[in-house]
Each structure stands twice: as structure tokens, then as C-alpha cells.
């Protein structure tokens, strides 16, 4: 029987799902149609499309996971179901995180301006570097999956009531193993987080410096450029804030989920964890002129369609 808290959790989870699906499906359709029409795919559009597809997959897993937690949390102790859901969530989250990291690095080298020779050298090799990062992410995904499989096996044994004797006899050994495995998972997730954080912070600093230079110039024609840079800074900080919330929620989830799997607070951790895949698509739409213009045209057509009176039947 679902409690009032479970109902609130499910309503918020469904709202996050619908909002994010609209944004990511829109990004995927616009970029695919543009690629087919132009017979050419740009690097940013390719990464954006892959990010949208991986996020859609993650959202489907999140929705199923939310219903499982909200309506039948006891099924998490079912070995095959619990393991399958956790592994699918981890794989889709891994791909989404790394693609978002590659996108932030791409925008950093594309937009930022630094005279340092290392920056110029890396910018010249930007496409190759992103390919290498994606290959690295696949190797880390394999490693993480192996570690996570062992982690799940031990954790499900601990929370399974049928293994109470095992839990009492070997609890210290099992918790020591879990601590090591959780540390490994945290370290591998810290790699994309550090790259994401570094690239966006340097991009923000570059935008701040460029905006300051525009303010110091007395040219009135620079006002629109200054405003554009201010909007870009706000979007960068919003994207960064969402990713930081996602990262720290992931660390909290790794450390407490299997210990407090039936606790009500885990539901709020899940909502915070899902904020990044649920909201980042709209930040990307606002930050991309092509997507923004297409969205404005779509909203304008929808507005006109709803205002058009239907003909009366004869």
C-alpha cells in the first residue's frame, strides 16, 4: 500500500520524466533532421544527439526504478530484478555523465580564449582528444560494471533477510569489502566530474574576462555581445550547479542506498540524483542558438494552432 510520501515521490518522479523527455526528444529530433537535411553532422550536434539518446535511456530506467521504489521497494531484494535495474541505471548514467563531460570540454575549447600554448595545442587536437575520452569512458564502464557486480552481490546478501546468519557472522568482512568497492566506484566517477568542473570553471573565467573587456570598451555596439556573454555565464553556472548536485547525490547514494534501502529519505536522494538528466536538456536548448530558434518557432506554431477556432460542424 503506497503511503502519501510514496505518492508525492511518484508524482515528482513522473513530472521529472515528462519534462526531461520533452527536452531530450526535441534535441534528438532537431539534430537528426538537420543532419539528414545538410548531409553533414557537426561534432557538437553529434555529442548533443548521443547525450539526448543516452539520457532518454536513463530516464526510462529511472521511471521504472521510481515505480519500483515507490510501490514495491521489497522487490529490490529480488536478486535478478534488483541487479538488472541497478546495472542498467549505472550504465546509462555512466554514458550520460561522460557525454556531458565531453560536451563541456568541447564548448570550453570552442568558446574560451586563453593565450597559453598548452591551451592552443589542445584546441588544435580537440576532436581527437574527445574521441580518446570516449574510448577511456568505455574502458572505465567495463571496470565499473565488474566492480558494481561484486558490490551488488555483497549488498543484496546483506539486505536479504534469508541471509541473517551470514550477515551476523560475516558483517565486518562484508562491510570492509563494500567500503573498498564503494571507494573504487567513487574514484572512477570523480574522473568525469573533475574534467567537467575544470572545463566549465575555465570557460566561466574566460567569459568573465571577455565580458569585462567589452565593458571597458566604449563601443555601444558591444552591448548585445556583453548581454550574450552574461547569458552564457548564467547557463554555464546553472549546468555546473546541476552536475555538482548530481555528483554529490551519486556519492551519497553509493554509500547509503544498500544500508538504508527501505528508508524514506532515499527517495529524496533519488529525486536530487535525477535532477541533472531531467533539467540539463533545457539548459542546452537555451544555450544553443539553433535549438533555441527552433523551439521558439515550435512554440509560436503551437500557440497559433491553439488559437485557431475550429469550424462548426454542419
Curated annotation (Swiss-Prot):
The chain crosses the membrane at residues 8-28, 51-71, 102-122, 128-148, 188-208, 239-259, 266-286. It is found in: Membrane. The keyword Methyltransferase does not apply. It is a multi-pass membrane protein. GO terms for cellular component: membrane; plasma membrane. One of its GO terms (molecular function) is G protein-coupled receptor activity. Residues 1-7, 72-101, 149-187, 260-265 are extracellular. Most taste cells may be activated by a limited number of bitter compounds; individual taste cells can discriminate among bitter stimuli. Receptor that may play a role in the perception of bitterness and is gustducin-linked. May play a role in sensing the chemical composition of the gastrointestinal content. The activity of this receptor may stimulate alpha gustducin, mediate PLC-beta-2 activation and lead to the gating of TRPM5. This is Taste receptor type 2 member 42. The lineage of its organism: Eukaryota, Metazoa, Chordata, Craniata, Vertebrata. The gene is TAS2R42.
Amino acid at each position: 500500500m503506497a503511503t502519501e510520501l510514496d505518492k508525492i515521490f511518484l508524482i515528482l518522479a513522473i513530472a521529472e520524466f515528462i519534462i526531461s523527455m520533452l527536452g531530450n526528444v526535441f534535441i534528438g529530433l532537431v539534430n537528426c533532421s538537420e543532419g539528414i537535411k545538410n548531409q553533414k553532422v557537426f561534432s557538437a550536434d553529434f555529442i548533443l544527439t548521443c547525450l539526448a539518446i543516452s539520457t532518454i535511456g536513463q530516464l526510462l530506467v529511472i521511471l521504472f526504478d521510481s515505480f519500483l521504489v515507490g510501490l514495491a521497494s521489497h522487490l529490490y531484494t529480488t536478486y535478478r530484478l534488483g541487479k538488472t535495474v541497478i546495472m542498467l541505471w549505472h550504465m546509462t548514467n555512466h554514458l550520460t555523465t561522460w557525454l556531458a563531460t565531453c560536451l563541456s570540454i568541447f564548448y570550453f575549447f570552442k568558446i574560451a580564449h586563453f593565450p597559453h600554448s598548452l591551451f592552443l595545442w589542445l584546441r588544435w587536437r580537440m576532436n581527437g582528444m574527445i574521441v580518446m575520452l570516449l574510448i577511456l569512458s568505455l574502458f572505465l564502464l567495463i571496470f565499473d560494471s565488474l566492480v558494481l557486480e561484486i558490490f551488488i552481490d555483497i549488498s543484496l546478501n546483506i539486505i536479504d533477510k534469508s541471509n541473517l546468519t551470514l550477515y551476523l557472522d560475516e558483517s565486518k568482512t562484508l562491510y570492509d569489502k563494500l567500503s573498498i568497492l564503494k571507494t573504487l566506484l567513487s574514484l572512477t566517477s570523480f574522473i568525469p566530474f573533475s574534467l567537467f568542473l575544470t572545463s566549465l570553471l575555465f570557460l566561466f573565467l574566460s567569459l568573465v574576462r571577455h565580458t569585462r573587456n567589452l565593458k571597458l570598451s566604449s563601443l555601444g555596439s558591444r552591448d548585445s555581445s556583453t548581454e550574450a556573454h552574461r547569458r552564457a555565464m548564467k547557463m554555464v553556472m546553472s549546468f555546473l550547479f546541476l552536475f555538482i548536485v548530481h555528483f554529490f547525490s551519486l556519492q551519497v547514494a553509493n554509500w547509503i542506498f544498500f544500508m538504508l534501502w527501505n528508508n524514506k529519505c532515499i527517495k529524496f536522494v533519488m529525486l536530487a540524483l535525477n535532477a541533472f538528466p531531467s533539467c540539463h536538456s533545457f539548459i542546452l536548448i537555451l544555450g544553443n542558438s539553433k535549438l533555441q530558434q527552433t523551439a521558439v518557432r515550435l512554440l509560436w506554431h503551437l500557440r497559433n494552432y491553439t488559437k485557431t477556432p475550429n469550424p462548426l460542424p454542419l
